[in-house]
């Protein structure tokens, strides 16, 4: 029978260091960013070998950021299975995530396009600024304004997609700047995610029931509900408790519904969809992006 020392020797150091990351990517995500990269390539015509590397870089950065997010949010589930740090511990998970970020930067350097490193640095700074202010709001129980929240989303959620498109632009002969469209799509993506977290059965199966409430997160519908009636502190108090009780979360959903926040969010999303389609048309049309917008529309529910 092999002892633990021998088993370690049979695996490479690289495999050991990457194990939390390998665990995460073994559970496939929605891969929306890869689909969007393909869609933007209809315009940018990036050389296939370079596009393959950009896809790899964005995938690495995305999954590394999820591992860190799950630690910072004290999450239980990711893609329907236990989060990496519940299997491998916080120290190893953080080290692995940081390691993967630097491996991704190494891939950028291999492409030997000087402007790409500057783009990566700028967007990784944006990502950490967005994450930092969101953590501050949660931990200090400070409810941001909608404008502050959208600014955070532009840094955090739009940042990775913007990084992908800016890397593609650096490798493309096109001189058209597509980042304004990317920002609209990124905002729509995050606000839709906030809505679905509180309303979708599939999100419950993958991340848990109304996980944003348990995380104490000021998401877009929660911000609207709190600011609609500042004198009613019930929702703010519930958020501060980071509830795990299903009944408490159901009550919070009722408070949000009565504030008209779900309908408000749906209207906001419809506006962003219209803005996206208008910008796509201005840029010459793109059937893949138009199809993407069509498939992510949020239909009205009975609330």
Swiss-Prot record:
Upregulating conditions: By blue light.
Note on cofactor: Binds 2 Mg(2+) ions per subunit.
Any Pfam family matching the protein: polyprenyl_synt
Gene Ontology biological-process annotations: carotenoid biosynthetic process; farnesyl diphosphate biosynthetic process; geranyl diphosphate biosynthetic process; geranylgeranyl diphosphate biosynthetic process; isoprenoid metabolic process
Binding residue positions for isopentenyl diphosphate: 30, 33, 62, 79
Keyword Nuclease carried by entry: no
Enzyme class, UniProt record, top EC level: transferase
Reported cofactor(s): Mg(2+)
UniProt xrefs under InterPro entries: Isoprenoid_synthase_dom_sf (IPR008949), Polyprenyl_synt (IPR000092), Polyprenyl_synt_CS (IPR033749)
Residues binding Mg(2+) 2: 69, 73
Keyword Cytoplasm in record: yes
Molecular function (Gene Ontology), one example: (2E,6E)-farnesyl diphosphate synthase activity
Transmembrane segments: none
Keywords: Carotenoid biosynthesis, Cytoplasm, Isoprene biosynthesis, Magnesium, Metal-binding, Transferase
Catalyzed reactions: isopentenyl diphosphate + dimethylallyl diphosphate = (2E)-geranyl diphosphate + diphosphate; isopentenyl diphosphate + (2E)-geranyl diphosphate = (2E,6E)-farnesyl diphosphate + diphosphate; isopentenyl diphosphate + (2E,6E)-farnesyl diphosphate = (2E,6E,10E)-geranylgeranyl diphosphate + diphosphate
Binding site for dimethylallyl diphosphate: 78, 156-157, 190, 207, 217
Enzyme Commission code: 2.5.1.-, 2.5.1.1, 2.5.1.29, 2.5.1.10
Alphabetical list of PROSITE patterns matching this protein: POLYPRENYL_SYNTHASE_1, POLYPRENYL_SYNTHASE_2
Subcellular localization: Cytoplasm
Family under the similarity heading: Belongs to the FPP/GGPP synthase family.
Entry protein name: Geranylgeranyl pyrophosphate synthase
Species this chain originates from: Mucor circinelloides f. lusitanicus (Mucor racemosus var. lusitanicus)
Lineage: Eukaryota, Fungi, Fungi incertae sedis, Mucoromycota, Mucoromycotina
Gene designation: carG
